[in-house]
């Protein structure tokens, strides 16, 4: 009878294990990890901004870190990933790039007319020959530059794409994949940039949340570039658990020798916040932390409301990293956003309610 009970108990445990929540596998840069609970990535807010312009990935207008995007050492490529959107916005991004070029050309044309008027004034006021010559050289440079300012579209046979650049070299392109826009910009395009864009597009794979492609490559939110594992990179992106949207964690992963620092995207005010000492009490955060199997220290501060005040909300910040000198950098930065920011409905939870959950995630990080 004892054996039967034991066998039944074993079967029950096996069934419970089978019904348990599957691990949420994800990746960033050249790392992979498991999340203890559902989360979301910050992405580019395509409805508000043009992907060619400045700005990184966000959760909402005021809830975000700074400098969230992907750098890939393939002609100094910069990549941004949009939030889920429509085909219409994909078309709009293409039009925005063309329109921006036209605006830039118009500014140069206006500048040319201003400099021509200035040349007339200089001559009328009998400025020196050298001054007149300098002004004529400025005008000549503008006259040579203006005809070259034009966006050319290149048909490289890549499905659902727009490829733009100069007449000789394409250097930026948009891909429409899985209801998202992926924007790629080559800051230093090679002579054979057209072929390199075709090669990169062939190696790029759009993916779903919690879907981790096989093989070496550089991972980003909803995307993956397959490669030989040797290309340099720098990926910074934020995530937040859906259960605690007031707290975000920015993860940084950069290849050895990259210029990335664990403090990228932070300001002096993140380390030394201004606050009313009559309302909040400041204390230090310093505790043991793990990124992968490497132990490090999580350091930061917390502002807790004093019990004698009516204030209920709090704020805190913490940062930890491993690597960067002799091995690839992996860093974690934690930020909070108070109730009411962009419609956040809850008070900021204390560090002890969130850090252990982040720790479960960071401790599972493994490099490719």
Placement of each model-derived feature along the sequence:
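Bacterial N-terminal signal peptides that target proteins for export
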Residues: 1-5
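Bacterial N-terminal signal peptides
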Residues: 6-15
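Boundary at the C-terminal end of the N-terminal hydrophobic targeting segment
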Residues: 17-22
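Surface-exposed amphipathic alpha-helical segments
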Residues: 29, 35-42, 184-221, 332-368
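Long, solvent-exposed N-terminal ectodomains/accessory regions
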Residues: 48-89
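Signature of long, low-cysteine stretches enriched in small and polar/charged residues
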Residues: 74-175, 238-326
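A short, solvent-exposed beta-edge/loop patch
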Residues: 165-189, 316-343
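Charge-rich, low-complexity N-terminal segments
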Residues: 191-197, 205-261
């Amino acid at each position: 009878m004892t054996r039967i009970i034991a066998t039944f108990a074993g079967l029950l445990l096996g069934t419970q294990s089978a019904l348990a929540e599957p691990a949420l596998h994800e990746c960033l840069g050249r790392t992979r990890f498991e999340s203890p609970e559902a989360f979301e990535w910050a992405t580019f807010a395509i409805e508000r901004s043009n992907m060619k312009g400045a700005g990184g990935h966000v959760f909402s207008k005021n809830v975000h870190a700074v400098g969230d995007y992907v750098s890939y050492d393939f002609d100094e490529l910069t990549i941004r990933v949009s939030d889920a959107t429509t085909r219409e916005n994909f078309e709009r991004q293409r039009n925005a790039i063309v329109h921006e070029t036209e605006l830039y050309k118009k500014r140069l044309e206006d500048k040319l007319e201003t400099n021509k008027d200035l040349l007339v004034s200089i001559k009328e006021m009998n400025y020196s020959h050298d001054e007149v010559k300098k002004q004529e050289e400025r005008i000549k440079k503008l006259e040579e530059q203006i005809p070259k300012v034009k966006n050319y579209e290149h048909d490289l046979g890549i499905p659902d794409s727009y490829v733009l650049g100069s007449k000789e070299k394409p250097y930026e392109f948009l891909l429409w994949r899985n209801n998202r826009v992926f924007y790629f910009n080559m800051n230093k395009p090679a002579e054979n940039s057209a072929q390199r864009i075709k090669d990169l597009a062939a190696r790029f794979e759009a993916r779903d949340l919690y879907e981790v492609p096989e093989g070496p490559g550089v991972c980003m939110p909803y995307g993956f570039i397959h490669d030989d594992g040797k290309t340099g990179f720098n990926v910074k992106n934020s995530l937040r658990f859906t259960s605690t949207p007031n707290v975000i964690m920015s993860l940084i992963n950069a290849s050895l020798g990259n210029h990335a620092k664990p403090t990228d995207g932070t300001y002096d005010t993140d380390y030394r916040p201004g606050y009313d000492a009559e309302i909040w009490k400041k204390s230090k955060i310093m505790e043991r932390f793990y990124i992968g199997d490497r132990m490090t220290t999580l350091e930061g501060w917390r502002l807790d409301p004093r019990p004698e005040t009516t204030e209920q909300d709090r704020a805190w910040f913490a940062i930890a990293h491993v690597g960067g000198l002799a091995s690839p950098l992996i860093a974690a930065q934690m930020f909070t956003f108070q109730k009411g920011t962009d419609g956040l409905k809850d008070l900021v939870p204390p560090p002890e309610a969130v850090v252990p959950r982040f720790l479960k995630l960071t401790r599972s990080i493994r490099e490719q």
